[in-house]
């Protein structure tokens, strides 16, 4: 329960009639406070963010949802409502990888509506994915980012991870039922290439066993960027990519050492068979490649080969925004704004080593074995890769696609011996990448992009998203960006800067003006009515006073009650027609105006916050860096 956010409770108690039973029942409730203290949606409302830019405030909710009461397991979420609705309602759920890396990376450095100008100022992200879709960022599994759990209760396999996520979604939709019928897209990057297919499969199973009175969740697509999906192909791609990009010279001493290690890796991959997502012998291949690049205290950045980093990190200090993000998310006013539970006693960290050490998934099959069934079940999948990433490089992604069998074909076969062509993608006159598609699977390679594509190219990434989601803005107007595949524009999507210049927004502004005039007009009407009533009452008392003077009025048996002084009458007038009541009426009427942005949350904006603020841990170290790069390497 948050100490920094005033909560409302739903108390629905039915007491047994028997006295002894009532006491037993009460003791049971006291032993389980959650049985009577339930949060509602307004408890998660984010009133504002410190340092947010000027302009319309985005509608946000954030906070913790308990998924495991026995071990205090809580997942943190941050939700943004979409800015516009194109042709249907959609929700994109974003997950970062690791395992154990926070989805606040995605929220504040990639696809969220804000980015940090510095450690205290937010600016709009011109390529935010919330333009035509609701965005839900979740720190998962338990122990990741703002999420927390008892230290001995981390998840160890991908199946339990997915089960916990189903519990989270079920409870989240109970809080926010208005989104349960949305088209749902599971999106993320890196190790989320394991999370996403497992969660999708768990949702499919849930829908199959669903009682008739519950809502099926409509998973309409999976989106995985630079994903860790198929260790067999992707571990082997390290050397291939290193040779291709000139990182390592064939037959060099370093190359020979890496080749020898790759042989051990291949043997281990054969030994583990269908299992094996994290193989230490294969991780060593990457370490040897990076060792060859260490010069003068620097080494290659494995997430963006165009950059270097300190020799003990090799990319773990990247991207450059991470320092500002860490400082911002540890600020007490930000912690309060995001409704962080007081049970979360340590400060936010990008990646949790405890989660990474425990989620080794030794008994879980790689997600590549789940993708064919999902594709054949009718769920479209989009895989995209930045071509300057080494750790989850595009060569490995292309190899896993080429070897994957689904829907009576292998890879991008259109028919036996015929492969789907690659299409050139040009964005605003510049080569952006290539598209390839067949049998429900789409692949996009981004030119000159790193491990975190939306960090480098936010607007291009949203153009890709809008195409995949089937966003069509022809019905609402607007000026789309010039995005062409093989010279053709295709479906019209909008990826312009915020605020989006659409006719829908112009109509919304016009509605705001009309609502404002109506609110003020109603307030004026009510004020006139109040004045008229007050004038009538005043006239009545004047008339009675004259009657008394003329002796024509009957005197009551309690004459003192009739002797209103001029001062008391003045007080009476001020209460009936004073500024206080007129402003109260105005606020009520102007709710119509504010509801255009806030909808049902208008009452929440007026809530106050109380309680104390617990100080976060001062431990500000970047937990990703470690002495053993092989063990603590993160697939973010």
From Swiss-Prot:
The family note in this entry says:
Belongs to the peptidase S10 family.
Q: What Gene3D superfamilies does this protein map onto?
A: alpha/beta hydrolase
List compositional bias (Basic and acidic residues) regions by residue number: 580-590
Q: Which reaction is this enzyme known to catalyze?
A: Preferential release of a C-terminal arginine or lysine residue
**Intervals, Cytoplasmic compartment:** 544-636
Q: What class of enzyme is it?
A: hydrolase
One GO term of the cellular component aspect?
Answer: membrane
Domain of life, per lineage = Eukaryota
Q: Which GO terms describe its molecular function?
A: serine-type carboxypeptidase activity
In the bilayer, the protein is annotated as: Single-pass type I membrane protein
| Keywords associated with the record | Apoptosis, Carboxypeptidase, Glycoprotein, Golgi apparatus, Hydrolase, Membrane, Protease, Signal, Transmembrane, Transmembrane helix
Q: What is its EC number?
A: 3.4.16.6
For this protein, the record's InterPro entries field holds: AB_hydrolase_fold, Peptidase_S10, Ser_caboxypep_ser_AS
Ranges of the Lumenal topological domain: 39-522
What is the source species? Arthroderma otae (strain ATCC MYA-4605 / CBS 113480) (Microsporum canis)
Its recorded name reads Pheromone-processing carboxypeptidase KEX1
> Membrane-crossing residues?
523-543
Signal peptide span: 1-38
In residue numbers, the region (Disordered) covers 575-636
Coiled-coil regions listed: none
- Give the active-site positions: 190, 389, 451
Q: In which compartments does the protein localize?
A: Golgi apparatus, trans-Golgi network membrane
Q: Which GO terms describe its biological process?
A: apoptotic process; proteolysis
């Amino acid at each position: 329960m948050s100490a920094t956010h005033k909560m409302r409770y739903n108390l629905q108690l039915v007491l047994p009639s028997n006295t002894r039973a009532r006491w037993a029942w009460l003791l049971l409730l006291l032993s389980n406070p959650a049985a009577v203290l339930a949060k509602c949606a307004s408890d998660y409302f984010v009133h504002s963010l410190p340092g947010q830019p000027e302009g319309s405030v985005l509608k946000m909710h954030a906070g913790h949802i308990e998924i495991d009461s026995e071990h205090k397991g809580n997942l943190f979420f941050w939700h943004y409502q979409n800015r516009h609705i194109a042709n249907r309602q959609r929700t994109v759920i974003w997950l970062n990888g690791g395992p154990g890396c926070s989805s606040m990376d995605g929220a504040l450095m990639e696809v969220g509506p804000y980015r940090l100008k510095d450690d205290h100022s937010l600016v709009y992200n011109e390529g935010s994915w919330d333009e035509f879709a609701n965005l839900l960022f979740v720190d998962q599994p338990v122990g990741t980012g703002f999420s927390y759990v008892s230290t001995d209760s981390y998840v160890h396999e991908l199946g339990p991870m997915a089960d916990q996520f189903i519990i989270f979604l079920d409870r989240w939709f109970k809080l926010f039922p208005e989104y349960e019928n949305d088209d749902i897209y599971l999106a993320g990057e890196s190790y989320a290439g394991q999370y996403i297919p497992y969660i999708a499969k768990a949702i499919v199973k849930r829908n199959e066993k669903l009682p008739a009175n519950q809502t099926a969740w409509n998973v309409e697509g999976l989106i995985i960027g630079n994903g860790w999906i198929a260790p067999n192909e992707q571990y082997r791609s390290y050397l291939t990519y290193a040779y291709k990009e000139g990182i390592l010279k064939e037959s060099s001493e370093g190359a020979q050492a890496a080749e020898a290690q790759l042989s051990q890796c291949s043997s281990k991959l054969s030994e583990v068979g269908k299992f094996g997502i994290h193989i230490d012998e294969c991780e060593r291949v990457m370490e040897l490649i990076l060792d060859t690049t260490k010069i003068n205290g620097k080494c290659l950045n494995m997430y963006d080969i165009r950059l270097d980093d300190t020799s003990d990190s090799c990319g773990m200090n990247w991207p450059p925004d991470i320092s500002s993000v860490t400082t911002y998310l540890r600020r007490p006013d930000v912690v309060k704004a995001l409704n962080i539970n007081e049970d979360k006693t340590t400060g936010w960290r990008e990646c949790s080593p405890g989660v990474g050490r425990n989620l080794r998934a030794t008994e879980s099959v790689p997600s590549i074995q789940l993708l064919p069934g999902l594709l054949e079940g009718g769920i479209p999948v989009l895989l995209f890769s930045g071509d300057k990433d080494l750790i989850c490089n595009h060569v490995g992604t292309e190899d896993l696609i080429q070897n994957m069998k689904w829907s009576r074909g292998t890879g991008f076969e259109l028919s036996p011996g015929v492969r789907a062509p690659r299409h050139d993608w040009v964005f605003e006159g510049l080569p952006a990448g290539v598209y390839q598609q067949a049998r429900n699977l789409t692949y996009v390679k981004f030119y000159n992009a790193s491990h975190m594509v939306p960090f480098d190219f936010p607007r291009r990434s949203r153009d890709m998203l809008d195409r995949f989601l089937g966003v069509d803005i022809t019905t609402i107007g607007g000026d789309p960006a010039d995005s062409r595949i093989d010279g053709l524009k295709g479906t019209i999507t909008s990826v312009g800067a915020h605020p989006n210049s659409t006719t829908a927004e112009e109509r919304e502004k016009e509605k705001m003006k009309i609502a404002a005039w109506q609110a003020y007009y109603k307030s004026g009407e009510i004020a006139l009515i109040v004045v008229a009533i007050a004038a009538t009452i005043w006239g009545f008392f004047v008339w009675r006073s004259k009657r008394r003077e003329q002796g024509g009025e009957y005197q009551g048996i309690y004459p003192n009650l009739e002797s209103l002084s001029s001062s008391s009458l003045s007080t009476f007038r001020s209460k009936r027609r004073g500024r206080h009541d007129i402003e109260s009426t105005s606020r009520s009427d102007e709710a119509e105006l504010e509801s255009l942005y806030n909808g049902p949350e208008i009452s929440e904006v007026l809530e106050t916050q109380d309680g104390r603020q617990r100080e976060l841990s001062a431990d500000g170290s970047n937990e990703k860096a470690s002495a053993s790069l092989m063990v603590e390497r993160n697939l973010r």
